């Protein structure tokens, strides 16, 4: 049974198989989550990512995790040239990030709230799109058994909690278990 977890904290601190970076088309990691990943994990992550650029909007690529606790970084291209995003792009980026995670044999994956920081996408809409996409992908492939949403701030946490509730399997023995971790 796959587990979805909400975690209030820094994605860079998580010991998981892969963390997801909300990337731009060029894969530069200067601000937001990408900047934090580069700062904590080292420049090698960005160097490896940029060598694979440009990457189409909604696609995802994998790099080393450098000095991070995670084993890999999945760069989900969710920001266009103007550093904006949309619902279909967030959906595609999440699904492709899950596909890359399966390809590298990841059992645990951590996501931030894609597109809501630099991209300025509405938090509630992003949460619902992301949770639905993750649930769909977990239903398709049981190889990933733990997805963590690393969220910063009460607003993001509430939005993802509401999205989990809105998309929950009504059967008592549903295919997913949810857990909240507040730090």
Task: Identify the meaning behind each predicted range.
Residues 81-183:
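Phosphate/ribose-phosphate-bearing ligand recognition and processing surfaces
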């Amino acid at each position: 049974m796959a587990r979805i977890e909400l975690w209030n904290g820094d994605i860079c601190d998580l010991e998981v198989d892969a963390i997801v970076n909300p990337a731009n088309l060029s894969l530069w990691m200067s601000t937001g989550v990408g900047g934090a990943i580069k700062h904590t994990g080292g420049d090698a992550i960005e160097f490896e990512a940029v060598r694979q650029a440009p990457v189409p909007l909604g696609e995802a690529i994998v790099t080393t995790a450098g000095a991070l606790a995670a084993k890999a970084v999945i760069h989900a291209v969710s920001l266009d040239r103007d550093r904006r995003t949309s619902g279909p792009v967030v959906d595609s980026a999440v699904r492709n990030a899950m596909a890359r995670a399966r390809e590298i044999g990841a059992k645990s994956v951590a996501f931030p709230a894609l597109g809501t920081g630099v991209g300025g996408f509405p938090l509630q809409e992003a949460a619902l799109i992301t949770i639905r996409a993750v649930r769909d992908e977990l239903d398709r492939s049981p190889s990933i058994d733990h997805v963590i949403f690393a969220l910063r701030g009460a607003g993001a946490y509430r939005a993802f909690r509401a999205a989990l509730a809105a998309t929950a399997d009504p059967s008592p023995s549903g295919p997913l278990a949810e857990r909240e971790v507040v730090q």
